[in-house]
Design a protein with these regions (language model features):
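Hydrophobic alpha-helical segments, especially transmembrane helices
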Residues: 26, 82-83, 206-209
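Glycine-rich phosphate/pyrophosphate-binding beta-alpha loops
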Residues: 196-210
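Short, surface-exposed beta-strand-loop junctions and turns on beta-sheet-rich folds
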Residues: 51-53, 136-137, 205
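Structured beta->alpha junctions
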Residues: 7, 51, 123, 168, ...
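Helical element adjacent to the flavin cofactor pocket in flavoenzyme catalytic cores
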Residues: 2-48, 53-57, 61
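Beta-strand residues in well-ordered beta-sheet regions across diverse protein folds
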Residues: 46-48, 131, 199-200
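Active-site substrate-recognition segment that forms the wall
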Residues: 57, 64-195
Length: 210
């Protein structure tokens, strides 16, 4: 189906501007400061450097690291290493100027269980982004995010079955990202402990709903 109100969210820029907005309104942001453990009954954060902080309530939205902060989640959600590739679109060829045509294209999602992918059209100078939507259900989020060239090319090959004019020769770069997957792909938003709340299991969809 086609959703006319759909569009591209530039996550990095949105987070950056949100942080500036909150800072100007007195919200204290602990940038680049990791949390080692969370006591969700007492709302105490342990930063792992000998310091702690007690707050009113704790919301844990830690992506693929959620199981390390909340071991009780380990049987409910699984970190899943996924691949994302960026494609340079041709401006001339048998199908014409694909670079221009794709700028007004919608986001696409192919939910094929074997070779599913999503495509994000190029906006604001970005390249066409294609990601695999076939859950690996493996990987450690602390590992590097490099992707082998052959593995990245395979993602382009899956998409090329549906998208004319795109081949592995157009592959520019690739990286890995992580989903946190619940067995039935149901989002988890619920209280935990006396003063905690957890948000997890978004299967890569969390940002747009946030």
């Amino acid at each position: 189906f086609h959703l006319t109100t759909g569009g591209v969210l530039r996550a990095g820029r949105i987070v950056e501007l949100t942080a500036h907005y909150l800072s100007r309104r007195g919200v204290e942001i602990h940038a680049h400061r990791g949390v080692k453990t969370v006591d969700i009954d007492k709302a105490i954060l342990d930063f792992g450097d000998g310091t702690t902080e007690q707050v009113d309530h704790v919301v844990v939205a830690a992506g693929p690291w959620v199981n390390q902060l909340l071991p009780a989640m380990a049987h409910r959600v699984t970190p899943s290493r996924q691949m994302v590739v960026y494609v340079d679109l041709p401006s001339a060829g048998p199908l014409g100027d694909l670079a221009t045509a794709w700028k007004s294209a919608p986001m696409l999602l192919d939910i094929d269980p074997d070779n599913g992918f999503y495509a994000v059209p190029p906006v604001a100078g970005d390249r066409l982004k294609i990601g695999d939507h076939k859950f690996s259900l493996t990987g450690d989020p602390h590992d590097d995010r490099d992707v082998a060239r052959d593995a990245a090319a395979a993602v382009v090959d899956w998409a090329a079955v549906r998208l004319d004019g795109i081949t592995r020769e157009h592959l520019e770069s690739a990286r890995a990202c992580f989903y946190t997957v619940q067995d039935e792909e149901r989002f988890i938003l619920e209280p935990m402990g006396q003063k905690g709340f957890v948000m997890s299991g978004f299967s890569g969809h969390g940002f747009k709903f946030g």
